[in-house]
Amino acid sequence: MGGLSVGSVVLIALVALLIFGPKKLPELGKAAGSTLREFKNATKGLADDDDDTKSTNVQKEKA
């Protein structure tokens, strides 16, 4: 199962351009990018918290 091909991405971009128009498209891209960045930071924070919890539990077991 592959990802999106170049042709698919171009088709999606053209449909988005037709639906939202050229003036609204940059705003939508910026909003989508910032949302994705926040999501990645949040999931990274959760993973870091999980790693900290595991290392604390291992240290308690050794003591």
Curated annotation (Swiss-Prot):
Record InterPro entries: TatA/B/E, TatA/E
Family: Belongs to the TatA/E family.
Top-level division of the source organism's lineage: Bacteria
Subcellular location: Cell membrane
Claim: Membrane is one of the keywords in the record: yes
A GO BP entry: protein transport by the Tat complex
Key words, A-Z: Cell membrane, Membrane, Protein transport, Translocation, Transmembrane, Transmembrane helix, Transport
Transmembrane segments: 1-21
Organism this protein belongs to: Shouchella clausii (strain KSM-K16)
Quaternary context: Forms a complex with TatC.
Database matches in Pfam families: TatA_B_E
GO cellular component, one term: TAT protein transport complex
Protein name: Sec-independent protein translocase protein TatA
Alphabetized GO MF terms: protein transmembrane transporter activity
Membrane topology reported for the UniProt record: Single-pass membrane protein
PANTHER family registered for this protein in UniProt: SEC-INDEPENDENT PROTEIN TRANSLOCASE PROTEIN TATA
Listed NCBIfam families: PRK14861.1 (NF011430), tatAE (TIGR01411)
Function: Part of the twin-arginine translocation (Tat) system that transports large folded proteins containing a characteristic twin-arginine motif in their signal peptide across membranes. TatA could form the protein-conducting channel of the Tat system.
